[in-house]
Amino acid sequence: MEPYLSNELFPPPTEAWLQTVSSDPEAQGWGAWGRTEKTSLVPRAGSRAGSDKEAEENEDASFLLSLLEPENLAKSPVFNQELEAIKLKLWAMEHAEAQPEPPCVQRKATEEERAEVRQLLSPETVDCFFSRTSKENVEADHRSVFVGNVDYGGSAAELEAYFSPCGEIHRVTILCDKFSGHPKGYAYIEFASHRSVKAAVGLDESTFRGRVIKVLPKRTNFPGISSTDRGGLRTHSGNRAAFLHGSLHRKARLRAHGRSRGHGGAPQWFSPY
């Protein structure tokens, strides 16, 4: 049985429909989706704008990547400016370390240092410092006593307990040899008041740890001034006297020998030295 074809049921395709089908793959059915898309003869405005944007983005990306290449980096003006700035900073730092300060700056610094030294070594500052120190030392010495013939095994705590009835004690000092560290056998006791010194002197010739101790008020030692007759003057005078004594005896020997030669006999007097 042959199929029955009727133009009324299936009219022939028109030219407009053919153009639409050829440009739109969806209108061709599902079989047309698997085939490669045919380019339209009439380009659309939207597709052209999209392709232009993609082209611009590709150009920008390729330009940025080209800037990162070493050859293009060396040719870049921004890179050259930054490199020159870094080189200039390094050069300035090296020259600042190697080159000395200008003479005016050095002269100003030396003048300031000299002014500070003059101020520190000025008589007013030195006198004020030494006067304050000497006054404090003199005041402490007036409140202290010297304790001699102290037993070597005695401690500062034992001395403090022994002299505590005399008054409040600020400090007990037992002098020791700086080389061996052994005590020298005497000590200094500093009291809080002058009255305690008088009471402590009353313990003179008393017995401490089986030994008779000597208690005296402490002397005040001034720098450069000796409180005894011993000193450089005595040594100088002694040397001078020895020199005079030796010169007199030398002259006496010369005279004795001269007379013996002149008279041809023994001298009238003899010096054994």
From Swiss-Prot:
Subcellular location: Cytoplasm
Stated name of the protein: Embryonic polyadenylate-binding protein 2
Function: Binds the poly(A) tail of mRNA.
Region feature Disordered, mapped onto this chain: 22-57
Domain of life the protein comes from: Eukaryota
GO cellular component labels: cytoplasm; cytosol
Gene Ontology BP terms: maternal-to-zygotic transition of gene expression; negative regulation of protein ubiquitination; negative regulation of SCF-dependent proteasomal ubiquitin-dependent catabolic process; nuclear-transcribed mRNA catabolic process, deadenylation-dependent decay
Pfam families noted in UniProt: RRM_1
RRM domain residues: 143-220
SMART domains: RRM
GO molecular function, one term: poly(A) binding
InterPro entries: Nucleotide-bd_a/b_plait_sf, RBD_domain_sf, RRM_dom
Keywords from the UniProt entry: Cytoplasm, RNA-binding
